[in-house]
């Protein structure tokens, strides 16, 4: 039987039969009631038919109806795939091994494309295409060079595949000397490969890709990554549509290829991720049966079992939730048997749909995507009926159905629907936010080579928004909605599935001067995502249909009084749930209530002071302490003098470059705990520039392994020099004494005294002070080690205002140790005896951080500080100790700076620990 025109059913090829009305509805009491329900169902049928074309799901509420239609479509696809694959495979060997230097080739449009070879690990190694009514086959490696060697066993199967390409029937032999045009790959090797498969090709001696006359006389076009043509994807598709079969072989190893991506797109296929098969080394084993291969190919990307669950409502009810675990307020259920498999299946579906979002492709405008459209419409209909909160155990069916629907969002479309209830993410006023009826022009400055920045507008739920950018130079641009990380939805916590699971959208690609229409069920803050940019360049963004949230954009050196006045007016209007602030090197994406509360309570409503301190007391304070090269800001004279005396480069923008823009999410939940580091970092309390938690989380982004004692044992300690410094400064400059019991000098001293009494004093102190691996163990005691050096440096320089300079110098030191020319600079950095740059491990068993601190502090203070490190139970390597000995500095007797305050340094008392353990000097 010929399989040449076996295309999968789609909107273009078939008027799909409608699903029957569910039987249980017909059993409802009363003929009139039943008739009314039937009429309603018919109306939903009509809405569904229209939505399959337009994407407008705003009136579609019957998710069961959509699921039935989806099930029919998935079954049609499975049957058609089964017929095609069964005819191709026959009883031939399934063995195929492309090796590590190969790429995956994935079906993109499931109605018209399918896997040909699926490895044992589930990776698609070759795919078939019926796109545009044609026939195509694509491999993730140049299989034509392998048929006489590593993949000789595959030759018979390739022969049948080529016969199907050329004749539409895998059993129909190709004619002798059938013309083959080879483009973008070695011609001789390609033709010899076809001969190795038992075929008899002849060189067409022309380019069927670019020459229509050649295409009309050729029987097969073989393409490799070296092919080129204007509008390559469109040209490939046109050749398919004209009836020219195409065989593509990826010739770029495990690397991605722009050319390959365009060719595959023309075939309705897509290239795998970076690295391809390099890590998985997937293959089809010789033991694979024809039945199994047909089963895998028929179900790939469709998950008929999941569809059946949805149709029947047969959600699993026996998950063992006792296996869930909780940590700092967030429950995870990774260890629940069976749950991971379910989650992975949903992730596969999400990935397939997000691939279209990322490429800014509207599924409702692409042929061959009926099943994917139905998935989107089913999820849209489910969202119409979501009610929060839900609980994994008490609301089993609703929970799992929502879990699946949350993963399925089509953003790129002309019309869609709003999710009526958004839970803890946003209230009803977000649904009713007015949007612009005309195009707005916004100019954005890109502060770094890559990152993202607030556009200053937001999408309203369910409303169409159009966005385009003008020439962005060499920068690659995308648009995204929202900035929350997935952990900000605490679905596994008891009754806390109370907001959508994926508030942050995928990055949606933008091309210069090409409008992209977006509809989000949730709405959200718009972000411009960029890479390959020139820092400081501007981009013009044109948006239509956007809503305006309170947005404060402070431009350095400009009068911001009007911007602040407008921001205050927008806050006072109380018409938005979210706001954004862009000021200097920080961007805040926050719930209005979390910022407004802090401004009113902590700043007496003074927005200008709040913004000033956000920059100066919070962000700039931390970056200055860490010694970064801040534009238009010189280092203090004391720091400059220390750098010059040692021959250090402390001003290089390459060595000491500022981090990119720091983003802050201020929301109901964080990725982890109440605050969670990263960029963005998350916090759940009101944003306060003087707050401890703000600088604690920012400090996590600035802490480095070379300044950690015992690696991770000070993971929650070394970051705290930033809030400690800020609190010291706030007391000194503003007279406000915050967090004054953070540093536990007294207990640190007691632990040291007890440890020193053992036969091995260093081991005794280590056991008491550093051995506990708990994340927050002995936090205040361990902090006391870091403040010792502030007090020591202040005494050494006889200037209390210089005390914190020691940590600035240590940051400047470690970046030069990390990045500067080693041989040229190691002596100036105090590493003269080290032939190689030292390690940089953050492991608790490593001494890398201990060593660097010992060397850096000894080198800066011009004293041998080994006694004090031993006093604190800090082990260092023989190499580090030998280096300190080589300095020839006088030994600094062990010391301990005692205090009964955290921020007030005038009360500090120095204890000489070299002759024993003096009495604690405070009551």
Swiss-Prot record:
Residues 1-41 form the signal peptide. The keyword tRNA-binding does not apply. GO terms for molecular function: metal ion binding; metallopeptidase activity. It is found in: Secreted. It is an enzyme of class 3 (hydrolase). Its main location: secreted. The active site is at residue 697. Its cofactor is Zn(2+). InterPro entries: IMPa_helical (IPR041549), IMPa_N_2 (IPR040711), Pep_M60_3 (IPR042279), Peptidase_M60_dom (IPR031161). Residues 450-794 form the Peptidase M60 domain. Its EC number is 3.4.24.-. Keywords: Hydrolase, Metal-binding, Metalloprotease, Protease, Secreted, Signal, Zinc. It holds the Pfam family IMPa_helical. GO terms for cellular component: extracellular space. Proteolytic activity is blocked in the presence of EDTA. Belongs to the peptidase M88 family. NCBIfam families: ImpA_fam_HExGH. Protease that degrades several proteins of the host immune system. Cleaves P-selectin glycoprotein ligand-1 (PSGL-1), leading to its functional inhibition; PSGL-1 is a leukocyte cell-surface receptor essential for leukocyte recruitment to the site of infection. Next to PSGL-1, targets host CD43 and CD44 that are also involved in leukocyte homing. Thus, prevents neutrophil extravasation and thereby protects P.aeruginosa from neutrophil attack. Is also able to inhibit the decay accelerating factor (CD55), but not the cell-surface receptors CD46 and CD31. This is Immunomodulating metalloprotease.
């Amino acid at each position: 039987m010929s399989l040449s025109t076996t295309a999968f059913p789609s909107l273009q090829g078939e008027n799909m039969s409608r699903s029957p009305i569910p039987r249980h509805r017909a059993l409802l009491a009363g003929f009139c009631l039943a008739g009314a329900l039937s009429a309603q169902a018919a109306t939903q049928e009509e809405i569904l038919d229209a939505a399959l074309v337009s994407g407008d799901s705003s009136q579609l509420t019957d998710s069961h109806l959509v699921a039935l239609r989806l099930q029919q479509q998935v079954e049609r696809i499975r049957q058609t795939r089964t017929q095609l694959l069964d005819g191709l495979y026959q009883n031939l060997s399934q063995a195929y091994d492309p090796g590590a230097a190969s790429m995956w080739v994935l079906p993109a449009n499931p109605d018209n494309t399918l896997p040909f070879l699926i490895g044992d690990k589930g990776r698609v190694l070759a795919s078939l295409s019926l796109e545009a009514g044609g026939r195509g086959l694509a491999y993730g490696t140049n299989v034509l060079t392998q048929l006489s060697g590593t993949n000789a066993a595959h030759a018979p199967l390739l022969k049948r595949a080529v016969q199907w390409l050329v004749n539409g029937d895998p059993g129909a032999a190709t004619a002798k000397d059938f013309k083959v045009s080879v483009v973008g790959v070695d011609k001789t090797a390609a033709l010899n490969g076809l001969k190795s498969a038992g075929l008899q090709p002849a060189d067409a001696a022309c380019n069927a890709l670019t020459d229509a006359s050649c295409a009309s006389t050729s029987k097969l076009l073989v393409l490799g990554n070296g092919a080129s043509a204007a509008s390559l994807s469109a040209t490939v598709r046109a050749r398919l549509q004209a009836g020219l079969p195409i065989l593509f072989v990826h010739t770029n190893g495990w690397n991605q290829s722009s050319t390959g991506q365009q060719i595959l797109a023309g075939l309705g296929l897509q290239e795998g991720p970076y690295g391809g098969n390099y890590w998985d080394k997937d293959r089809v084993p010789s033991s694979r049966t024809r039945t199994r291969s047909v089963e895998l190919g028929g179900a790939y990307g469709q998950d008929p079992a999941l569809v059946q669950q949805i149709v029947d409502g047969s959600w699993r009810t026996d998950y063992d939730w006792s296996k869930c675990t909780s940590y700092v307020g967030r429950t995870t259920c990774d260890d629940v048997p069976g749950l991971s498999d379910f989650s992975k299946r949903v992730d596969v579906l999400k990935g397939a749909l997000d691939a279209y979002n990322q490429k800014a492709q509207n599924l409702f405008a692409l042929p061959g995507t009926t099943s994917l459209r139905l998935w989107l419409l089913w999820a849209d209909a489910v969202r119409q009926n979501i009610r929060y909160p839900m609980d994994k155990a008490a609301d089993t069916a609703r929970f799992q159905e929502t879990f699946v629907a949350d993963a399925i969002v089509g953003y790129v479309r002309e019309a869609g629907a709003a999710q009526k209830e958004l839970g803890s993410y946003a209230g009803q006023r977000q649904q009713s936010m007015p949007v612009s009826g005309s195009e707005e022009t916004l100019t954005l400055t890109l502060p770094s080579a890559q990152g993202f920045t607030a556009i200053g507008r937001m999408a309203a739920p369910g409303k169409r928004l159009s966005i385009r950018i003008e020439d962005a130079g060499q920068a690659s641009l995308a648009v995204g909605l929202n900035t929350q990380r997935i952990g900000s939805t605490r679905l596994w916590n008891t009754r806390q599935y109370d907001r959508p699971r994926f508030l942050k959208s995928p990055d949606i690609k933008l091309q210069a001067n090409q409008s992209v229409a977006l509809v989000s069920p949730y709405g959200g803050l718009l972000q411009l995502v960029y890479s390959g940019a020139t820092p400081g360049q501007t981009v013009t963004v044109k948006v239509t249909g956007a809503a305006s949230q309170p947005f404060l954009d402070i431009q350095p050196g400009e009068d911001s009084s009007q911007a602040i006045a407008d921001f205050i007016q927008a806050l006072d209007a109380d018409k938005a749930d979210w706001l954004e602030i862009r000021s200097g090197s920080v961007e805040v994406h926050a719930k209005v209530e979390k910022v407004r509360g802090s401004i009113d309570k902590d700043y007496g409503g003074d927005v200008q002071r709040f913004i000033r301190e956000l920059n100066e007391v919070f962000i700039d304070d931390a970056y200055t302490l860490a010694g970064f090269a801040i534009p238009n800001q010189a280092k203090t004279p004391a720091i400059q003098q220390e750098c010059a005396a040692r021959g250090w480069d402390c001003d290089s923008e390459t060595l000491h470059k500022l981090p990119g823009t720091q983003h802050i999410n201020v929301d109901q939940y964080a990725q982890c705990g109440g605050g969670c580091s990263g960029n963005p970092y998350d916090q759940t309390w009101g944003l306060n520039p003087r707050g401890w938690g703000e600088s604690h989380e920012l400090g996590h982004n600035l802490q480095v392994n070379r300044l950690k004692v015992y690696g991770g044992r000070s993971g929650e300690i070394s970051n705290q020099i930033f809030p400690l410094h800020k609190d010291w400064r706030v007391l000194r400059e503003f007279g406000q004494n915050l967090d004054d019991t953070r540093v536990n000098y007294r207990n640190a001293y007691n632990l040291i005294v007890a440890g020193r009494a053992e036969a091995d004093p260093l081991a005794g102190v280590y056991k008491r002070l550093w051995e506990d691996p708990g994340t927050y163990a002995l936090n205040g005691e361990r902090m006391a080690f870091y403040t010792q050096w502030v007090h020591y440096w202040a005494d050494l320089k006889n200037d209390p205002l210089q005390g914190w300079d020691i940590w600035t110098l240590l940051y400047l030191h470690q970046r030069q140790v990390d990045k500067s020319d080693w041989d040229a600079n190691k002596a100036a950095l105090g590493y003269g005896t080290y032939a190689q740059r030292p390690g940089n491990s953050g492991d608790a068993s490593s001494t890398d951080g201990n060593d660097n601190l010992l060397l850096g502090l000894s080198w800066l203070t011009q004293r041998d500080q080994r006694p004090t490190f031993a006093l604190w139970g800090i082990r260092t390597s023989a190499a580090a100790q030998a280096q300190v000995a080589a300095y020839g500095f006088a030994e600094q007797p062990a010391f301990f700076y005692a205090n009964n305050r955290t921020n007030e340094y005038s009360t500090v008392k120095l204890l000489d620990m070299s002759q024993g353990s003096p009495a604690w000097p405070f009551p």
